[in-house]
Amino acid sequence: MSRKDGFLALLVVVVWGLNFVVIKVGLHHMPPLLLAGLRFLLVAFPAIFFVARPKVPLTLLLGYGLTISFGQFAFLFCAIKFGMPAGLASLVLQAQAFFTMALGAFVFSERLQRKQLAGIALAIIGVLVLIEASLNGQHIAMSGFMLTLAAAFSWACGNIFNKKIMQHSPRPAVMSLVVWSALIPILPFLLSSLLLEGADHITQSLITIDMTTILSLLYLAFVATILGYGIWGALLGRYETWRVAPLSLLVPVVGLASAAVLLGETLTGMQLAGAVLIMAGLYINVFGFRVRRTARVSG
C-alpha cells in the first residue's frame, strides 16, 4: 500500500472512530432508525441530481445498499435496542474484518500468507482484550450480541459486493456508487422507524430538532458516509481485501480515545493493552512485506 493510500486509510479510521461520539450526541434528540434514515437521505439528495448513475448491474447496487447500509445499521441499532452496550457494539462490529477476509477467500480465492495470518491473529487477540475490558461488570444479552455479529456480517457482505462492483468496471466511479446506493436504505429505514419508533416520536423529533442534531446529521452524511465510504470503496477496489479490511480494527481504538477526550470517558489498562496489540497486528499484516523489501535494498 502506498504512503498516500495509507494516509487515506488512516483518515477514514479517524473519521469513523469519531463517528461513535457524533452518533451518541445525535441520539440524544432523535431515535436511531430515523437518524439513520435521514443520514442516507442527505447523502442521496441533492447529490443524486449531479452525480451520474454508476454503470454497474442493478443487482450488485441493490446488494451493496441492502447489506453495507441498511443491513449493517438496522442490525446494529436493534442490537443496542435489545441491550447491547453501544461501546461494546463498536468493538464487536469489527468482526467484519475477519468475515470480509473469509468471504474474500471463498468468493475471490484470495490466499492469505503466514505473515498476514500472524498479524491477524495478534489483532484478534487485541480485539478480544478490548471486548473483555468492556464486558467487565456489564450484563450482555445474547440477542444483542448476535445481532451485532449480524451487523458485522452485513458490513462484510457489503465489502464483497463493493469488490465485485469495482471488478465490473475498469474505472469505477466511487462517489457515484456511494450516492446512488444511499437511495436504497432510505425507504427501509423510514418504514422501520415508523413501525418501531412510532409516528408521534418521529414528529416530535423533527419539530424539536436542534443545531446539535443537525450538525450530527451533516457529519454522518457528508463526512462519515460520502468521504469515508468513498475512500474505503476505492481502497477495496485497488488492493486485496486482506490488506484493507484489517485497518478497520483501528476504528474502536480511535473511538475509545475520542470518547476519552471529548466525552470524558477513561481508558483502562486492558483497553490500552488491546489497542497496542491491534496496532502491532496491523503493522505486521499491512507493512510487513514492505519492511523486508526495504531492508533487502538497503543491504
UniProtKB/Swiss-Prot annotation:
Query: In which domain of life is the source organism classified?
Result: Bacteria
Q: Is this entry keyworded Transport?
A: yes
BP GO annotations: amino acid transport
Q: Which residues lie on this side of the membrane: Cytoplasmic?
A: 1-6, 53-59, 109-116, 161-175, 238-243, 290-299
Q: Principal localization?
A: membrane
| Segments on the Periplasmic face | 28-31, 81-87, 138-139, 197-216, 265-268
Gene3D superfamilies per the record?
A: 1.10.3730.20
Keyword Nucleotide-binding assigned to the entry: answer is no
Q: Where is the EamA domain?
A: 14-132, 153-287
Query: How is this protein positioned relative to the membrane?
Result: Multi-pass membrane protein
Q: What residue ranges are annotated as transmembrane?
A: 7-27, 32-52, 60-80, 88-108, 117-137, 140-160, 176-196, 217-237, 244-264, 269-289
What InterPro entries does the entry give? AA-Vitamin_Transporters, EamA_dom
Q: Could you list this entry's UniProt keywords, alphabetically sorted.
A: Amino-acid transport, Cell inner membrane, Cell membrane, Membrane, Repeat, Transmembrane, Transmembrane helix, Transport
Q: Where in the cell is it found?
A: Cell inner membrane
Entry GO CC: plasma membrane
Which PANTHER family would you find in this protein's record? Answer: AMINO-ACID METABOLITE EFFLUX PUMP-RELATED (PTHR32322:SF9), INNER MEMBRANE TRANSPORTER (PTHR32322)
Task: Tell me the protein family, please.
Answer: Belongs to the EamA transporter family.
| Purpose of the protein | May be an export pump for several amino acids and their metabolites, including cysteine.
Q: Indicate what this protein is called per its UniProt record.
A: Probable amino-acid metabolite efflux pump
What species is given as this protein's source?
Answer: Salmonella typhimurium (strain LT2 / SGSC1412 / ATCC 700720)
Question: What would be the name of the gene that encodes this protein?
Answer: eamA
